[in-house]
Amino acid sequence: MGCCYSGETDTGKGDQGEREHLLPQNQSLPNNKQNGSEQNPTNNPSARTDEQAMLSRILAKTAQNIIDVSAVESQGMEQHECMDRARQYSTRLAKLSSNLMDWKNVPPLPSLTSQPHQILASDPVPFTDIQQVSKIAAYAFSALSQIRVDAKEDLVVQFGIP
């Protein structure tokens, strides 16, 4: 049914298979044209057997790294173990749900309108209006950032109290 790829590699081999060349170093790639004519791979039986050998080696390495999940024996639980776990889960769930009761007492968000579907279905705000509001907000920010207070005299005045 299901299979998983095992990414584990044998530590004795290291990363040898990963860095191993598929073609031997002394063997170069064959030229497509030899003496002006194309080379047909079916005409060269040694190249075909080498290719088959490489494909077989890749297939064997892949088969070693696959774990058949359907063949793995499942752990059987006895009835009392199952009941214990169910009891544990229900107590944990009760603890967590008691914290959720605090959220039920929170009042809902204020309703700005009694018919939100009409607002959501209405035409969008024109882009020129959005630009105008942005421009006004920028002017207001600029004006507020330029406000300076100059202290010309003491703010606290001492009265003649004996």
From Swiss-Prot:
Q: What does this protein do?
A: Key component of the Ragulator complex, a multiprotein complex involved in amino acid sensing and activation of mTORC1, a signaling complex promoting cell growth in response to growth factors, energy levels, and amino acids. Activated by amino acids through a mechanism involving the lysosomal V-ATPase, the Ragulator plays a dual role for the small GTPases Rag (RagA/RRAGA, RagB/RRAGB, RagC/RRAGC and/or RagD/RRAGD): it (1) acts as a guanine nucleotide exchange factor (GEF), activating the small GTPases Rag and (2) mediates recruitment of Rag GTPases to the lysosome membrane.
The record's annotation in SMART domains points to: LAMTOR (SM01262)
Name used for this protein in its record: Ragulator complex protein LAMTOR1
* PTM remark: N-terminal myristoylation and palmitoylation mediates its recruitment to lysosome membranes, thereby promoting localization of the Ragulator complex to lysosomes. N-myristoylation by NMT1 is required for palmitoylation at Cys-3 and Cys-4.
List the biased-composition ranges (Polar residues): 24-47
**Main subcellular location of this protein, as a coarse class:** membrane
Location of region: Disordered: 1-50
Q: How does it sit in the membrane?
A: Lipid-anchor
Q: Which GO terms describe its molecular function?
A: guanyl-nucleotide exchange factor activity; protein-membrane adaptor activity
Q: How does it assemble?
A: Part of the Ragulator complex composed of lamtor1, lamtor2, lamtor3, lamtor4 and lamtor5. The Ragulator complex interacts with slc38a9; the probable amino acid sensor. Component of the lysosomal folliculin complex (LFC).
